[in-house]
Amino acid sequence: MSEDKMDLYLQQGMYGPLETKPDERHLFLGSLRERVVLALTKGQVLRSKPYKEAEHELKNSHNVTLLINGELQYQSYSSYIQMASRYGVPFKIVSDLQFHTPLGIVIAADIAVNRELIYIQDDIYNRSVLKS
């Protein structure tokens, strides 16, 4: 085994396997942009009424997972967990204290769906840091 391969092998043993697109994975709560069906900012999740678009995607999309930002308070996303449970969609609370993301909830598919529009672009979104 060459020295470069040995070094790579040792690094992966100590730090884990290499990760593809780490910045993208940090933004989308562990998923990739190509798999995102819908993404809500933290501010949108804090809205008193859940988005109908989120319920529509949870109800009608197949093989998706609801990813929730662990920095949020439970009461802000509990209605989304209830929706996911109602439609048999698994959910994960992602708590990565090392990286911060402006997103609060991501509905992600198991495979690439390549949706062009993944954000609900309302007033709350327009005030967020994601606005282009």
Curated annotation (Swiss-Prot):
Signal peptide: none annotated. This is Uncharacterized protein YueI. InterPro entries: DUF1694, Ribosomal_eL30-like_sf. SUPFAM superfamilies: YueI-like. The gene is yueI. It holds the Pfam family DUF1694.
